[in-house]
Structures are given as structure tokens and as C-alpha cells.
Amino acid sequence: STTGAAVSNAAVILSADKSTSGISALTDGRTDYTVYRNGVLSSVSALRKNDVVTYDAVSNTVYACDTRVTVYYESCEPSPSAPVSIKVLGGTQFDVLPTAQQSLSNFKPGKTMTLLLTSDGTVAGAVENDYSARGNAIGIVSGSKVQLLCGSTTIDLSLTGMTVDSKLDGKLVSISSSSKTSVGLYAKTGGVSGDLNVREGTLGSKKLASGVMLFDDGVLKNLSDLTDVSVPQSRISYARTNA
């Protein structure tokens, strides 16, 4: 898939905006690769500090993802010093890349940390919760279920023993956790403003990407699925750009 997850067992976390440092190690020196960022066709100029980059050699495609989620570290396998998988967010299991084990070894279960995720939802690194790499994870609530949006992938959260507020049904929410017994879900509002022109594929003055993710009452839809010619800003609860 040209918009999906990268096939890779290694990742690079960018140290600066528009940086290609470290990418050549993934691509074996090739520079003629295609770039996708958060599931959308992009370019090196759109890359940002702390983006996680992986590489699919078959399609010669670089995948960048900026999803960062602040979590309470619940458990891991087989050990905190070299975890291959961890559980966070109410028992949700995330696989850990070999290249991420060193940064994860700085944390032990019972602590909070911010995970940097690849475009397919694998852990590429872990950092302290600070301004330089603050969590930005968002998801969609559908009934009692919550899906974390990661690149062009959605990840079902386990939320074991937790109850989702029915008032959040169908809403886009921010996601974070600082304790074993709860996950913070807060409705997102605002963001990019403007009316959605379905026919022209624009939001205000901005052109929508072909792989734009749209949610209508919590259901993922394509732009072509919308029957309205336009959707006024008053009916759009939240929108953001890939930048």
C-alpha cells in the first residue's frame, strides 16, 4: 500500500525540521524515494522534528509519522531493559522496534512517558514528557470503543476496566494517560477553520489530500461518501492539517 504502514524493523527519529539525517541509513543511500507523512503523499520539506521515519525498500517509500502519545507504563515483555512489547492505555499492547529498546530501557513500569510511534503503530522510541516532544495523540470514539489514529492506521484501544463517557460518542478526542486506572479522553474542537467544499475537495482555502481521513459521527468515510455538496464550518467540530 502506498499510503499504509512501512515494512521495516528500524526507524529514525528526526532531530530537526526537514532533516534527512539518518534516513540514508534506512534507504541504503538512496535519495530518490517517495515520502508519505501521516498517510498522505508529501515531501522532505514537510518533515518535522521528532517525526518517526521508516522505509519500505520494495516500494522505495519513506513513511513519516508524528503521532506521540503520553502514557502510563503498565507492563512489558520480556523485561524493562529489553522490551519487545509493552502494555499501556488500559492493557493495549504495542510492539517495540529493536531500535527503540534503548530509549525504553530508561523507563520502568509505573512511570509515565511519551511514546513516538511509527505509521503502523509500533513503538519507535520513548521520551520524557516535556515541551520538546509533548503528546499529540488523537482518536475517535464509537460507542464504548476508542481508536487511536496513527498515520493512516487506526489502533483499537483495550481500555480494560474503563468506561467511556457516552457524551464523547462520535467525537474526535485527545488521548493520554497518567495512571493505570484511567485514560484521559477530551473532545477536540477548533483547529483549521473554513467550510468543507466536497465537490472541490477543499477546506476553506486549503486543498484536501487524496487520502484525507474524514469522520462522520465516529465513522471513517471517504470524501466521495459525503452526499452534501458542502459542509459549513459550524458542523465541523475539528480539523487539522498535515503540517
Q: In which residue ranges do the predicted regions lie?
A:
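...the same signal can extend to comparable exposed beta-sheet modules
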Residues: 1-243
